[in-house]
Structure formats: C-alpha cells, structure tokens
Amino acid sequence: MTTEQARGQQGPNLAIGRQKPPAGVVTPKSDAEEPPLTRKRSKKERGLRGSRKRTGSSGEQTGPEAPGSSNNPPSTGEGPAGAPPASPGPASSRQSHRHRPDSLHDAAQRTYGPLLNRVFGKDRELGPEELDELQAAFEEFDTDRDGYISHRELGDCMRTLGYMPTEMELLEVSQHIKMRMGGRVDFEEFVELIGPKLREETAHMLGVRELRIAFREFDRDRDGRITVAELREAVPALLGEPLAGPELDEMLREVDLNGDGTVDFDEFVMMLSRH
C-alpha cells in the first residue's frame, strides 16, 4: 500500500475525531481532563486554620470558648477577685483596748498621785510666797483699802495671778459672792475661793522649786538620777504599799529617753506632765 493510500484510510477517522459536537449536545469530560474544583478560603477561615496549627500540638481548643472555661479565676472562697478573707477590723481591736485596763497609766497615778497632790493638788497648803502673791493681788484691787473687793473686780484680780477664768466660771463665782458674801469678799474668803483654782492653773509656773523637792524625794543618793531601785524604795513611803516591779520598769522605759536605765530631772518633769 502506498503512502497516499494509507493517508486516505486515516483521513476520515481523524476528521471524525476532530469534529465538533452538534449544538446543544454536551460531551462529558474525563477526570483527567477536568481540573479539581477549589474554593477560595476567606480570611477568617485562614486565620482559624493557622490558629489550629499553632495550638494543635498542645491540644488546646481555639475559637469559641471551651465548655466551662471563663476569664474569671475559679472561686476560692476568699472574697471578690481572690482577696484574702477579711481580717478582724479595727473595731474589734478598739474593743479589746477599751476593755483592757491601762496598767501603765494606773500605775503612774498610784505612784505619783499622792505626791502630786501634796506638791500641786488642791489639798496642799499654800506656801508663804504664794500667800504673799495673793495678798499683793488682793491689795491691788482693794482701791479704797477697806479690806474688801467686789465681785466685779474678782475677774481682773484672778487674771493678774495668771488664772484665766471662763465667762461661765466668773458668772458662777460672782453669783456665789453676791448670794452668800454680800457681793464682796475679804482676803481670807478670797484665798478660800481662789486658792484651789489658782493651784491647778499655775502649778507649772510656781512648781519648779516643788518639782526639785519631789525629785530629791526619789533621788536618795543625790546623784541627780532616779533608778528603779530608788523608785521601789520611795513608792512604799508614798503609797503605803509596794508597786509591782514590772510596772515600775515599764514606766521607767517610757521616759528613759537616753536609754541609760535611769531618769534625770528633765525626764522626771516629762513623766509628771504625762501622768
């Protein structure tokens, strides 16, 4: 068979294979010819897929919250936000202090009360210098020298002595003088009326000498310092009964500013002013 004859036999077949199908007829394509269908992922899905890759090895669940999970920590019974249980407030502390006796203050009162009353208190006798001071003030306001001053002059006389009465105190004294003393007082009545108030108000001005005397009562060896042993010796004489050693030690530590275990005169004055 010649070449031309062979081409003539194949020609119709090749032509038939290249013919287009009639209009309206769909010819199925093979799987090899049709590319696989793909859908473009959204940004949200790509982010979710990347998150799964990062956490997939640890087994943690991403995306929506896992069941039972919460941003708040589990409750521990300690109050809001894990705060520790409330401790007893200051009210309970104040209550304990209110019911607890102030042993230091009580000991100071028992120790120094009788001495201070004798040195500064209402029950002590006025000294000659104080009587002279009262006499001078009385005579200053007894302008007619009849031995009396009126209730109107009493306030100014008291201020001259350093005592600063309130208006209510002056009113009470004036009414007392007008009702019981005929509106005026002599010197003895003046001392009886003003003496106790004057002693209370002016003790810090008149009492330096008396404080020295009181300090010497404690300072038995006259070394200018008071020791615990000297306090223990002095207290029975002042109180008629001994004071417990720990109470004395506590009072001494309170005022012992330089920490030498003794009390000098300045510390002694501070101790008396506190109690």
UniProtKB/Swiss-Prot annotation:
Entry PTM: Phosphorylated. Phosphorylation levels change with the light conditions and regulate the activity.
InterPro entries: CaBP1/2/4/5, EF-hand-dom_pair, EF_Hand_1_Ca_BS, EF_hand_dom
Polar residues bias spans: 1-12
SMART domains per record: EFh (SM00054)
GO biological-process terms attached to the record: photoreceptor cell morphogenesis; phototransduction; retinal bipolar neuron differentiation; retinal cone cell development; signal transduction; visual perception
Localization of this protein: Cytoplasm; Presynapse
Domain EF-hand: 129-164, 183-200, 206-241, 243-275
Chain coiled-coil ranges: none
Function: Involved in normal synaptic function through regulation of Ca(2+) influx and neurotransmitter release in photoreceptor synaptic terminals and in auditory transmission. Modulator of CACNA1D and CACNA1F, suppressing the calcium-dependent inactivation and shifting the activation range to more hyperpolarized voltages.
Protein name: Calcium-binding protein 4
Organism from which the protein derives: Homo sapiens (Human)
Gene transcribed to yield this protein: CABP4
